[in-house]
C-alpha cells in the first residue's frame, strides 16, 4: 500500500480514537452535571470519569498498587487542597470529602446528610431496615447499642472474652505449625460477637454463620451484578442461607420466651424480641433479622484486623514491643494475689497500649469510605452538594494526610503523647449520630487479646517480606501465615 495513503489513514484512525474517548469521558459529566442548571457552576472540582464505571478503575488501580493513597493524592495535586471533590464512585455521582473539617461537617450534620449505601449493601444487609426513617432508626439503634456500651456492659464481657482469648491462644500455641493468623482473629471476634448477640453460643451455629459471612463480605465490596460467577451473586445466596438460619433461631427463642432466662444468658436477640414501641407494637421478624445481620457483621471485622495489625506493627518495632509488654507485666505485678483475670479498671490503666491501638487503627485504615447521601442541596466550604448525590467520607485520606499526621506512613504510638485530637481527624468508627455503636467493645477485645499475647506468645511469620494487599482490606497478601509460639 502506498505510504502516502497509509499515514493519513493511520492519523485519521488515531484522531477518531481520541475524539471517541474524549466523547465517552464527557458522557457522565453531561448526564449528571449538565442537568443541574446554575448549580453546576458551584460544584467542587473533579471529573466524573467513564460511563457507568466513573473513576472506579483509577481507585482500584491505586489500591492494587503499593501506594493506595495515590488516588486522593492525585485529586489534591490536580485540584488543590479543597478537601471536597466531585467524582463518580461506587456506581453513583459522588462528593469526596477528605479533610478533618469537611469530614466533621458531613458526619455531624444529620439534617442534610443521611445514611447512604451502595445498592449492593442495601440488598445484602436488608433494604427494609437500611431504608428506615431517621426516627425509627434512632429507636432501633438505641435497642442495639445498649448491649455494647458503658462500663456496666463492658465489665460483663471481660471474663467471657478472656476465656475465649486464653483458649484460642493455648490451642494455637500448641499445634506447632503455621496458621492463617487473620482467619484465626476473625474466628475469635465472631465468637465474641456471637455471644453478645445470642446470649449463649453454639460452636456449630457460629461456624456456619461465619462461613456465610465470608461470602457476604465479598459481595458488599463488589458491584451489584447478580450473575453466577460474580461475588454479589454468591453473597445473595449466602444471605438467603443466613436469613433461613436466623429465622430458625428466632423461632426457637420465641418458643422459650416464657421460660425465665438468667440475665447473663440474654442476648441482643432477646432484647429485640421483647422490644415494643409506644403503641405496644413489636418489631417484625424481618427487621430483627436485618439488625442481627448488620450487628454480627460490624462486630467482628474491625477487631480482627486491628488485632492482627497491632501484633505485626509491634513485631516490626522491638523497642515498642518491649515497652508494651512491660506495661502488661506491671499490671500483673500490681494485681492483688486473690484476683484472677483482668478487670476493666486494669484495662483503663494500659496507657501505652491505648496509643498502640489508636495508631494501629489510624495506620491500617480501610479503603471503603463512610457513605452518606445529601438529603437536600447542601453546601460544604462554599461548594454545592446536589440533593441525592452520595457523599464519601474518606477516613483513610484523613488518617494518612501529612498535614494532619507528621510522617503518616510511620507506625508511631508516641504521636499520641499529649495529643489533642482535632475534630474529624481520627474517625476509625465514623462520627456523629451514626457512629459505630460497637466501638468500645471492639477496643475491649483488642486490649484483652494483646494483653495475653504480649505476656505469653510471639508470632513467627512464614513470609516476613510478604507484600501488603489493600483490597478488599489492608492485609499481608498471605493473610498473615505464621506460627504462634508460647514464650511465657
Curated annotation (Swiss-Prot):
Taxonomic lineage of the native organism: Eukaryota, Viridiplantae, Streptophyta, Embryophyta, Tracheophyta
Pathway assignment: Secondary metabolite biosynthesis; terpenoid biosynthesis
Known role: Monooxygenase involved in the biosynthesis of limonoids triterpene natural products such as limonin, a compound with insecticidal activity responsible for the bitter taste in citrus. Catalyzes the epoxidation of melianol to produce 7,8-epoxymelianol.
Family: Belongs to the cytochrome P450 family.
Main location: membrane
Catalytically driven reaction(s): melianol + reduced [NADPH--hemoprotein reductase] + O2 = 7,8-epoxymelianol + oxidized [NADPH--hemoprotein reductase] + H2O + H(+)
Cystine pairs: none
Pfam family, one: p450
Enzyme Commission number(s) of this protein: 1.14.14.-
PANTHER family xref list: CYTOCHROME P450 26, CYTOCHROME P450 88D6
Membrane protein topology class: Single-pass membrane protein
Membrane spanning residue stretches: 4-24
Record key words, sorted: Heme, Iron, Membrane, Metal-binding, Monooxygenase, Oxidoreductase, Transmembrane, Transmembrane helix
UniProt: heme binding residues: 436
One example of a Gene Ontology biological process annotation: pollen tube development
Location of the protein in the cell: Membrane
A molecular-function term among this protein's GO annotations: ent-kaurenoic acid monooxygenase activity
UniProt key word Aminoacyl-tRNA synthetase: no
Organism: Citrus sinensis (Sweet orange)
Protein name: 7,8-epoxymelianol synthase CYP88A51
SUPFAM superfamilies on file: Cytochrome P450
Cofactor: heme
Tissue: Accumulates in mature fruits and in juice vesicles.
GO cellular component: endoplasmic reticulum; membrane
Superkingdom of this protein's organism: Eukaryota
Gene of this entry: CYP88A51
Statement: the UniProt record of this protein carries the keyword Transmembrane helix: yes
Amino acid at each position: 500500500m502506498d505510504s502516502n495513503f497509509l499515514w493519513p489513514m493511520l492519523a485519521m484512525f488515531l484522531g477518531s480514537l481520541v475524539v471517541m474517548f474524549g466523547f465517552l469521558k464527557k458522557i457522565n459529566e453531561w448526564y449528571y452535571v449538565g442537568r443541574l442548571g446554575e448549580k453546576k457552576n458551584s460544584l467542587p472540582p473533579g471529573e466524573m470519569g467513564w460511563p457507568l464505571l466513573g473513576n472506579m478503575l483509577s481507585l482500584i488501580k491505586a489500591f492494587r498498587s503499593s501506594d493506595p493513597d495515590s488516588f486522593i493524592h492525585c485529586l489534591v495535586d490536580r485540584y488543590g487542597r479543597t478537601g471536597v471533590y466531585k467524582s463518580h464512585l461506587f456506581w453513583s455521582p459522588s462528593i469526596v470529602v477528605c479533610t478533618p473539617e469537611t469530614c466533621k461537617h458531613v458526619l455531624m450534620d444529620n439534617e442534610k446528610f443521611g445514611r447512604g449505601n451502595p445498592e449492593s449493601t442495601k440488598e445484602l444487609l436488608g433494604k427494609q431496615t437500611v431504608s428506615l426513617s431517621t426516627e425509627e432508626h434512632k429507636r432501633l439503634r438505641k435497642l442495639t447499642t445498649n448491649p455494647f456500651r458503658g462500663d456496666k456492659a463492658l465489665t460483663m464481657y471481660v471474663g467471657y472474652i478472656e476465656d475465649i482469648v486464653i483458649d484460642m491462644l493455648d490451642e494455637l500455641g500448641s499445634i506447632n505449625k503455621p496458621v492463617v493468623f487473620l482467619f484465626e482473629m476473625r474466628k475469635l471476634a465472631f465468637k465474641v460477637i456471637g455471644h453478645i448477640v445470642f446470649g449463649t453460643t453454639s460452636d456449630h451455629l457460629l461456624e456456619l454463620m461465619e462461613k456465610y459471612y465470608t461470602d457476604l463480605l465479598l459481595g458488599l465490596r463488589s458491584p451489584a451484578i447478580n450473575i453466577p460467577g460474580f461475588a454479589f451473586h454468591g453473597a445473595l445466596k449466602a444471605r438467603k442461607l443466613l436469613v433461613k438460619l436466623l429465622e430458625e433461631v428466632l423461632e426457637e427463642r420465641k418458643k422459650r420466651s416464657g421460660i425465665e432466662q438468667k440475665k447473663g444468658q440474654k442476648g441482643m436477640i432477646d432484647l429485640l424480641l421483647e422490644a415494643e414501641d409506644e403503641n405496644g407494637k413489636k418489631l417484625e421478624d424481618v427487621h430483627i433479622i436485618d439488625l442481627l445481620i448488620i450487628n454480627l457483621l460490624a462486630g467482628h471485622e474491625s477487631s480482627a484486623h486491628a488485632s492482627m495489625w497491632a501484633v505485626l506493627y509491634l513485631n516490626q518495632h522491638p523497642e515498642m514491643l518491649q515497652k508494651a509488654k512491660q506495661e502488661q507485666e506491671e499490671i500483673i505485678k500490681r494485681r492483688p494475689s486473690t484476683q484472677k483475670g483482668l478487670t476493666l479498671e486494669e484495662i483503663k490503666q494500659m496507657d501505652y497500649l491505648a496509643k498502640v491501638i489508636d495508631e494501629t487503627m489510624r495506620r491500617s485504615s480501610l479503603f471503603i469510605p463512610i457513605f452518606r447521601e445529601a438529603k437536600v442541596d447542601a453546601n460544604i466550604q462554599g461548594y454545592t452538594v446536589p440533593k441525592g448525590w452520595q457523599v464519601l467520607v474518606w477516613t483513610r485520606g484523613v488518617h494518612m494526610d501529612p498535614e494532619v499526621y507528621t510522617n503518616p506512613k510511620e507506625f508511631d504510638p508516641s504521636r499520641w503523647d499529649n495529643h489533642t485530637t482535632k475534630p474529624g481527624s481520627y474517625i476509625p468508627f465514623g462520627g456523629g449520630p451514626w457512629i459505630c455503636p460497637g466501638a468500645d467493645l471492639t477496643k475491649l477485645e483488642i486490649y484483652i487479646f494483646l494483653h495475653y499475647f504480649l505476656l505469653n506468645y510471639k508470632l513467627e511469620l512464614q513470609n516476613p517480606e510478604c507484600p501488603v494487599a489493600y483490597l478488599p482490606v489492608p492485609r499481608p497478601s498471605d493473610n498473615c501465615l505464621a506460627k504462634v509460639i508460647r514464650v511465657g
